[in-house]
Amino acid sequence: MKPVKIITKAFSSFLWVGYVPVAPGTVGSLAGAVVWFVMPYKTIRVRLPVVLLFFLIGLVVAALEEKETNKKDPRNVVIDEVVGMWILFMLIGCMYFKDSIPKTATAFVLFRVFDVAKIPPMRVIEKIHGGLGVMLDDVVAAIYSAIVVNLVFFFL
């Protein structure tokens, strides 16, 4: 396998996490959450550029994987779930796992529900050609989840 393909597969599958046989999207989301909480530098000023960089990388590698597999949003591509989780955690203010276990767990479950259910306009967004459609539907799932989590924890 050529080095470019290896790099593409490594990024798109978040270091091969996307190749687990059962529920790769859920496992990818969980891997993203774990990495988020072990990342050093718990400030938005540091994290935001990392998230933006991974979003841009995701645009490219998701498009390349779609082209290679001839499938829309292949199961092994989980960088979109990872970036979606990271955006969600930024939007709900979760930087430290130990301080926000209920909020983190709620966010994770809601993100997976919204990502799987594809509540409008996610179906339309998912149909956008290439990596943009792959990445954006998870961004929308993150936004929907953040709205619900923030409302729930505001009123609790």
Regions found by a protein language model. Name each.
Residues 44, 48-68, 153:
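Hydrophobic, well-ordered secondary-structure segments
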Residues 2-27, 60-88, 112-143:
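Interhelical loop and helix-boundary elements at the membrane-water interface
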Residues 38-40, 56, 61, 92-93, ...:
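Hydrophobic membrane-targeting signal helices
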Residues 29-33, 48-55, 101-112:
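Hydrophobic core segments of alpha-helical transmembrane domains in multi-pass membrane proteins
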Residues 36-49, 88-103, 150-156:
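Helix-coil boundary and interhelical linker segments in multi-pass alpha-helical membrane proteins
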Residues 138-154:
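Final/C-terminal transmembrane alpha-helix of multipass membrane proteins
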